[in-house]
UniProtKB/Swiss-Prot annotation:
Signal peptide: none
Alphabetized Pfam families for the sequence: ANAPC3, TPR_1, TPR_6, TPR_8
Keywords: Repeat, TPR repeat
Protein name: TPR repeat-containing protein MJ1345
């Protein structure tokens, strides 16, 4: 070894080479041992963050949080450490703690768009809609063509019951990104709730064309077709939905309602009974069965079913 070489730096360099090699081979236990050796040579926030990330990969989340905190003790405004700590807290469902981390990040001058998005997401999950909207409006002021921000704003307004304002936001999101199925689904739901069934059906069918396993879109399509009296089509979509989700009592209920409307009362009763086998406390199933029994002239049985429905409603 030549004169003037700092052995400590040389040894650390070897450790880093071995560490990156272990990471590449996904040998996380070895990488962790090497990080500990590096920490013996040099304590730094970057190294603590690396250790925290390995611990998270290994599922040792509490220890990972401990090392993110060690990094932040040395460098409180370390954006990456704050972000990763906050993201871990979100994944653990610790939203209040995550909120504090991301609000701190938002106050930093260098906070970027992902930070603001995640902060708004957390606030939305916590039901702090006004605060979330303030952050989203700041994003939209700077990035008016952010489809994600328009969609987030639309979802919050939807949760607040402000359907027309929410619809405007989803329309803006879809102008920017027409392939956004989630925004299209929300648009369909809103149009349905506003009684604009034809427009809603068009949106929801587009969602289903793009993703034929979207049960939520199917549920709304079935309801709309029932409202529009297009019963045979509703029946076909119900069959498709039952293939995807054969244990959903609501689908059996829809099928029973459709069969009742088609005058197929004996078949309808079978489906209402299936609903009641899964959950005997669904009043609409008792009510639907009562209607079918009444149409079949089985008045006493119908009265009994009506009474069961009334007991649940009360």
């Amino acid at each position: 070894m030549g004169e003037g070489v700092n052995m400590e730096i040389y040894n650390e360099s070897i450790l880093w080479d071995e560490y990156f090699d272990a990471l590449e081979k996904r040998n996380y236990e070895k990488a962790l041992l090497l990080i500990d050796k590096i920490l013996e040579v040099r304590e730094s926030p970057d190294v603590y963050v690396r250790k925290a990330r390995i611990l998270r990969t290994l599922g040792e989340n509490d220890k990972a949080l401990e090392y993110f905190d060690k990094a932040l003790k040395l460098k409180p405004k370390y954006i990456l450490a704050n972000f990763l700590k906050g993201a871990l807290l979100v994944s653990l469902g610790k939203l209040e703690e995550a909120k504090e981390v991301f609000l701190k990040l938002c106050r930093l001058e260098k906070s970027d768009l992902p930070v603001k998005y995640v902060t708004a997401f957390i606030l939305k999950k916590l039901g702090e809609y006004d605060y979330a909207l303030k952050i989203i409006d700041k994003i939209l002021k700077k990035y008016p063509k952010s489809a994600i921000a328009w969609a987030e704003k639309g979802e919050i307004l939807y949760r607040e019951g402000k359907l027309k304002k929410s619809l405007e936001c989803f329309d803006n999101a879809l102008k920017i990104n027409p392939k956004d199925c989630q925004s299209l689904l929300y648009k369909g739901e809103i149009l349905f709730k506003l009684g604009r069934y034809g427009e809603a059906l068009k949106c929801l069918k587009k969602v289903f064309e793009r993703n034929n396993k979207d049960i939520r879109a199917l549920m709304y399509i079935i309801q709309i077709l029932i409202y529009l009296g297009r019963l045979n089509q509703a029946l076909e979509y119900t069959k498709k939905a039952l293939k995807l989700n054969p244990d959903d009592p609501l689908l059996y209920l829809y099928k029973g309602i459709i069969l009742n409307k088609l005058g197929k009362y004996n078949e309808a009763i079978k489906y209402f009974d299936k609903v009641l086998e899964i959950n005997p406390n669904i009043p609409d199933a008792w009510n639907g069965k009562a209607i079918a029994l009444e149409k079949l002239g089985k008045i006493n049985e119908a009265i009994e079913c009506y009474n069961r429905a009334l007991d649940i409603y009360e």
